[in-house]
Amino acid sequence: MPVQGSPRSLLGAVNSTPTATPHLRPAANQTGPQCLEVSIPDGLFLCLGLVSLVENTLVVAAIAKNRNLHSPMYCFVCCLALSDLLVSVSSVLETAVLLLLGAGALAAQATVVQLLGNVIDVLLCSSMVSSLFFLGAIAMDRYISIFYALRYHSIVTLARARRAIAAIWAASMLSSTLFIAYCDHTAALLCLVVFFLAMLVLMAVLYVHMLTQACQHAQGIARLHKRQRPVQQGWGLKGAATLAILLGVFFLCWGPFFLHLTLIAVCPQHPTCSCIFKNFRLFLALIVCNAIVDPLIYAFRSQELCKTLKELLLFSW
C-alpha cells in the first residue's frame, strides 16, 4: 500500500522508485523517450476487484457445497479461487482505504495507516505467490492424470493434496512476509522474479508435453478409424489454441508486474525504465484481470461445478 513513510511496504517500495514526468512528455533534464502512462480510474479498479471477488466466491462456494467436487483436483482449483479472491480483497481494500484517506473521510494516525498498509501488502503478496503455486499444482495434477492415469488415485490422494495445500499456504505467507521485510533489497525482488519464471517454465513444459501426447493419441485413433488428415490437423490446432490461451493469459497478466520488479532491480534510474514504472497500477489491474479469467479457464468448464453453481444461485433467489 503506497503510504508515505512506509518504505518497507511492498507497494510503497515499488511505487517509490524514481519515475518519469507525466503523460507523453520527456522527463525533465533528460533526453530519454516519451513516457506513456496508462491511467486506471479508481472506479474501474474497484469494479474489476468486485467482479473477481464475486466470481471466485461463487467457485469456492460451489466446490464446498458439492461433495462430488471434494477431489484433489478441485481442491487445487478451490485454493486457486481462494488465492484470487484474496488478491481481489486486498486490491479493493487498498483502493477503498486510499480513496477514503484522500477524501478525508477516514482519519487515522500515520502509524496505524502504515500498519494497515503492511498488512494489506503481506495479504496481497502472499495471495499472488499462492496463486502462482496453485497454477503450477493444477498443471502437475493434470500431467499426472494423463501420464500416470492408472496410478493417479494412488499418487494424488486427498491426504497428500491437503498436505501440499498446507505447505503452499505456509510457504506463501513466509515468503511474502520476508519479501515485505526485505523489499528494498535487490535479492528479494530477483527471488520473486525467478519464482515467476520457474512457474512459467514448469507450466509450459507440462502443458506442451500433454498437448504432444494428446495429438499422438488422436492420430492413433484416427488411423484405427481411417480418418482423413484434415480431421487430425483440426484437432491439433484446437489443442494448440487452448494451450496458447492458457499460457498467453498467464504471461500477459503476470509478466508486466514481474518485468516491473526486474527493472527496479536492474535499472531504477534509467529513463526508459522510469517510464515503465509509471504504469504500476496497470500491472496490478492485469493481475486482477487474471483473477477474473482463472475461473473461466479452470472452474467453469466443469459441468458438475456449473450445475452446482446454478443450484446455488437458484436457491439464493
UniProtKB/Swiss-Prot annotation:
Transmembrane segments: 38-63, 73-93, 119-140, 164-183, 192-211, 241-266, 280-300
SMART domains documented for this protein: 7TM_GPCR_Srsx
InterPro entries: GPCR_Rhodpsn (IPR000276), GPCR_Rhodpsn_7TM (IPR017452), Melcrt_ACTH_rcpt (IPR001671), MSH_rcpt (IPR000761)
GO biological process terms, semicolon-separated: adenylate cyclase-activating G protein-coupled receptor signaling pathway
Chain positions covered by the region annotation Disordered: 1-26
GO CC annotation: plasma membrane
Parts of the chain on the Cytoplasmic side: 64-72, 141-163, 212-240, 301-317
MF (Gene Ontology): melanocyte-stimulating hormone receptor activity
Residues the record marks as carrying a glycan: N29
Compartment(s): Cell membrane
Extracellular side: 1-37, 94-118, 184-191, 267-279
Entry keyword Mitochondrion: no
Predominant subcellular localization, coarse grouping: membrane
Gene3D superfamilies reported in the protein's UniProt record: Rhodopsin 7-helix transmembrane proteins
Annotated function: Receptor for MSH (alpha, beta and gamma) and ACTH. The activity of this receptor is mediated by G proteins which activate adenylate cyclase. Mediates melanogenesis, the production of eumelanin (black/brown) and phaeomelanin (red/yellow), via regulation of cAMP signaling in melanocytes.
Subunit structure: Interacts with MGRN1, but does not undergo MGRN1-mediated ubiquitination; this interaction competes with GNAS-binding and thus inhibits agonist-induced cAMP production. Interacts with OPN3; the interaction results in a decrease in MC1R-mediated cAMP signaling and ultimately a decrease in melanin production in melanocytes.
Identification of the protein by name: Melanocyte-stimulating hormone receptor
Natural source organism: Hapalemur griseus (Gray gentle lemur)
